[in-house]
Amino acid sequence: MAESLPTEFDVVIIGTGLPESILAAACSRTGQRVLHIDSRSYYGGNWASFSFSGLLSWVKEYQQDSDIEEESTVSRQGLIPETEEAIALRKKDETIQHIEVFCYASQDQDTEDNVEEIGALQRNPSSVASTTITELDSACLPEERQSYFTDYEMPANHTQKSDKEISLGITDVEESLEKEKDCGDNTCIHTILGGHKDEDKHTVEDNTGQAKKNRITFSHIVKEGRRFNIDLVSKLLYSQGLLIDLLIKSNVSRYAEFKNVTRILAFREGKVEQVPCSRADVFNSKELTMVEKRMLMKFLTFCLDYEQHPDEYQGFRQCSFSEYLKTKKLTPNLQHFILHSIAMTESSCTIIDGLKATKKFLQCLGRFGNTPFLFPVYGQGEIPQCFCRMCAVFGGIYCLRHKIQCFVVDKESGRCKAIIDHFGQRINAKYFIVEDSYLSEETCSNVHYKQISRAVLITDQSVLKADSDQQISILLVPPAEPGACAVRVTELCSSTMTCMKDTYLVHLTCSSSKTAREDLESVVNKLFTPYAETETNKEEPTKPRLLWALYFNMRDSSGISRSSYNGLPSNVYVCSGPDGGLGNEHAVKQAETLFQEIFPSEEFCPPPPNPEDIIFDGDDKQPEVPGTNNIIMATIDSSEESKNLESPEKHLPH
Amino acid sequence: MSMEDYDFLFKIVLIGNAGVGKTCLVRRFTQGLFPPGQGATIGVDFMIKTVEINGEKVKLQIWDTAGQERFRSITQSYYRSANALILTYDITCEESFRCLPEWLREIEQYASNKVITVLVGNKIDLAERREVSQQRAEEFSEAQDMYYLETSAKESDNVEKLFLDLACRLISEARQNTLVNNVSSPLPGEGKSISYLTCCNFN
């Protein structure tokens, strides 16, 4: 590294997940000197999203983790005086388990390239060694820029969709992605296949004689790997939720763009159907009878201000929400919709929780669109980075790939004084915020974690075909047997910039009872069919076909109370990893709570000055003597119009 | 929606090693200032300058790295939706030139393929300390299919030219695009920024 880190800060933050990133922005916004570091080569920790090759590298990293030798750490001797002691941090991340990868898409086209691929893999170590840039980044990068423009034939049916791009929000020039979609690069493939012999055994063999038309092969996916932004956590933003409010309030929203979730789906009697949820949807629904429409509207209207009508539910306090719905003269159809798709609760949930959830759903409807949810373009992984950008704009210093050995604690006061990094450098600060996966086994010996089961699928069709193939859908699949967990399914189309054209990215999430595959495979089989199987079948497949699947378990540390950690100094604050919930409320609440604990008198993420309103001291005079001031002082000229920040929206249709 | 008094708005993003003069280029162009000895850029997210080109108002939104380049930790979202990238090195610093391929890799991965990239060798006022010859840079930029220009933020050499040429190119690209996709109005439900303005209410 060309430069070494400064050594004096107010706040050191370890981990770049969502709560840590929000905190970083909040602290830096109040003028604190913030150092924000992550041992990984990417932002977001378990909140990250990856390109396809990036995800494969991530898988590989976890699979190899066990045989990586302990890094030789620089001795701490001499760095810590007698009056201080060290609390070691964990060296390896242990939050991910039971990773399983299945490739259903044909790999036949790849065989000829294989020799070259392995060779290409050999090439990599030297280039990695010579640069601090991570192998994750370089893995899917072209060697030569020109090769980018080599022609690559795509299935024939994609051309008419080229106008589907995202409006940039800040420009009226539509940025066409048409070209990008057609460009492939051979180097992409190489690193990946070489490293993935493990998965190859799962590969379902494909008949080479099949018609190639319209087929998506594994090499297509690899070539278009950059088109994927695959989130490790699957979440959505409630349009009246805490995260949206914070994004807007702090103006961090200017770094991201969002799309509305377009459909709420239900899975009932083996069939996927669309749930009508807005007033217009209900009235336009073809599935519902006139009577049902009235019943549903009546019930939903009641839920919006259920607190005002306690007599409607007081008598049922002992019932579960599902039992209560039965008493409301709702048809089974409607009961299912409300319970699983609108309230999105388990059958056993209490009546008040059910009403609360229904009300929240209804309140979020219509703020930005027809469903209560938004999804960030390029994936959820963008969000922590947006907060990091805000932190950096206010002077926060960023350093990825930076490992920390330990906290240094003053024996007398019991307070943490510093951290020591993998170079043996001591970095002093007043407050320390750490993501819990960095805490050592010793610190966490009394902690019991929950687990989240996750699946990531690449499929060739939507679970429910519609006029437009660009749908973002959420579906809750109720448990097959009582006591099991409902599975949340999110299906993303290519215009969310999370998957390549003609594919869908499907995320499954539930709280774990077994390994992710054991928890989720039955739902995957209900909704999808493996790619190869249907190829021999002459009939038009009714289910979308699976091209690729990944299962893993992620640790859910969201419920852990601070007191369960052993021996942490009082000025070390702990953030948890992602929770299994649909929204981001937990992370935002945690960040705000910790911020207020640390800086009780400061405002949490106030709006920054409008860039267009900033005038610089010295604008009208010659700059000061060199070296007198290293900081550009910004002041706000309030006389200027203050609406310009909103200019991006001005190009949007309403 | 028609209140904005510009015909085009473009997002231009600067990248390159720390200390090559990115912020100086932006400040020179947007404010006509050259701040010596200036280190970090606090609280400034992007700078705006509206220029007129052939009678059309072009608003340039110019984004700086916010210091995240110092330890090679630029967020991906920084590159998203940029219309143009200015890849900057310091002609008196070989190292800043040698790092260009690394920056190009980041561009490849995170920026749109449509992005226009300009290579800028800054600090030509320090010609006596030059370490990177013009010819090398030209060859490199040609090989990478980039425009190339040498500037001095201090002497204000080529700074206007850099941004104005870029604006011209962006306009002609934009024109071509609107011709190609004649229906340029975004479809409902396409990516949007959120703010209080975009809200509508239930019912």
Swiss-Prot record, chain B:
Cysteine methyl ester carried by residues: 200
SUPFAM superfamilies: P-loop containing nucleoside triphosphate hydrolases
UniProt remark on domains: Switch I, switch II and the interswitch regions are characteristic of Rab GTPases and mediate the interactions with Rab downstream effectors. The switch regions undergo conformational changes upon nucleotide binding which drive interaction with specific sets of effector proteins, with most effectors only binding to GTP-bound Rab.
Gene assigned in the entry: RAB30
Family (UniProt): Belongs to the small GTPase superfamily. Rab family.
Sites of S-geranylgeranyl cysteine lipidation: 199-200
Keywords per UniProt: Cytoplasm, Cytoplasmic vesicle, Golgi apparatus, GTP-binding, Hydrolase, Lipoprotein, Lysosome, Magnesium, Membrane, Metal-binding, Methylation, Nucleotide-binding, Prenylation
Keyword Oxidoreductase: no
Organism lineage string: Eukaryota, Metazoa, Chordata, Craniata, Vertebrata
Region (Switch-I): 36-44
Class of the enzyme per the UniProt entry, highest EC level: hydrolase
One BP term from GO: Rab protein signal transduction
Protein's organism: Homo sapiens (Human)
EC number annotated for this UniProt entry: 3.6.5.2
Catalysis performed (reactions): GTP + H2O = GDP + phosphate + H(+)
Documented activity regulation: Regulated by guanine nucleotide exchange factors (GEFs) which promote the exchange of bound GDP for free GTP. Regulated by GTPase activating proteins (GAPs) which increase the GTP hydrolysis activity. Inhibited by GDP dissociation inhibitors (GDIs).
Function according to Swiss-Prot or TrEMBL: The small GTPases Rab are key regulators of intracellular membrane trafficking, from the formation of transport vesicles to their fusion with membranes. Rabs cycle between an inactive GDP-bound form and an active GTP-bound form that is able to recruit to membranes different sets of downstream effectors directly responsible for vesicle formation, movement, tethering and fusion. RAB30 is required for maintaining the structural integrity of the Golgi apparatus, possibly by mediating interactions with cytoplasmic scaffolding proteins.
Reported cofactor(s): Mg(2+)
Region (Switch-II): 67-83
Superkingdom of the organism of origin: Eukaryota
Any one Gene Ontology cellular component term annotated for this protein: Golgi membrane
Stated name of the protein: Ras-related protein Rab-30
Propeptide residue range(s): 201-203
Family annotation (InterPro entries): P-loop_NTPase, Rab, Rab30, Small_GTP-bd, Small_GTPase
Localization, UniProt: Membrane; Golgi apparatus, trans-Golgi network membrane; Golgi apparatus, cis-Golgi network membrane; Golgi apparatus membrane
